Regions:
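Short, low-complexity, polar/charged sequence segments that are solvent-exposed and flexible
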Residues: 63-66, 80-82, 147-149
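SAM-dependent methyltransferase catalytic-core segment centered on the flexible catalytic loop
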Residues: 69-122
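SAM-dependent nucleic-acid methyltransferase catalytic core
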Residues: 1-76, 87-98
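Conserved S-adenosyl-L-methionine
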Residues: 160-170
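Charged/polar, solvent-exposed surface patches and flexible loops
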Residues: 31, 51, 55, 81, ...
Length: 171
């Protein structure tokens, strides 16, 4: 996955490509070495968080849902496909696979309800949430789907909330 980005004719994501871009002569794909001293009870999941939290309990749950209307699957479908090695049919000039079943409700007007359901279903001592609200700094597609007020209301209904804010430069 790291090697793919070095020869991609994209701008860091895979939703669009740069026409007439030059490729390197070769691509070397290497497998990163897994960390061998991980605690044996640590687990990593790759599935819809709203489904996952119904089946697990944890000390800490870290969530980083999509912030705006830009669907992750549109930008990172190629990396996801290589990681899973599913080789789906592709279509169109850009040779994209059908991603309709991968769309996230967090990128729609249903984001607040999906977030509330997620938080209510989490069984953990701590929830760590990363959420970027650009407010009026970006274009309309960059605007957060869940307001800060709704996030705080939902989290406060679950338990004690501490907010840590970090300034950032919008691009």
């Amino acid at each position: 996955l790291y090697g793919m980005d070095k020869i991609a004719v994209t701008c860091g994501h895979y939703d669009a490509y740069r026409k007439n871009a030059e490729f390197e002569d070769s691509l070397e794909l290497s497998v990163p070495l897994a960390k061998v001293d991980n605690h044996p009870l640590n687990q990593c999941f790759n599935e819809d968080a709203n489904n996952l939290v119904k089946r697990i309990e944890a000390d800490l749950v870290y969530i980083d849902p999509p912030y705006n209307s830009r669907q992750y699957c549109d930008s990172y479908h190629l990396l996801e496909n290589v990681a899973r090695w599913e080789k789906p049919q592709v279509f169109g000039v850009a040779k994209k696979m059908d991603r309709s079943g991968m769309k996230s409700k967090y990128c729609t007007t249903g984001a607040t309800k999906a977030f509330e359901t997620l938080i209510n279903d989490i069984k953990a001592k701590y929830i760590l949430l990363s959420y970027n609200n650009m407010a009026d700094k970006g274009n309309c597609r960059s605007n957060a789907k869940i307001s800060d007020e709704d996030i705080l209301k939902i989290l406060n209904a679950k338990g004690t909330v501490k907010v840590f804010e970090e300034s950032y430069k919008a691009f």
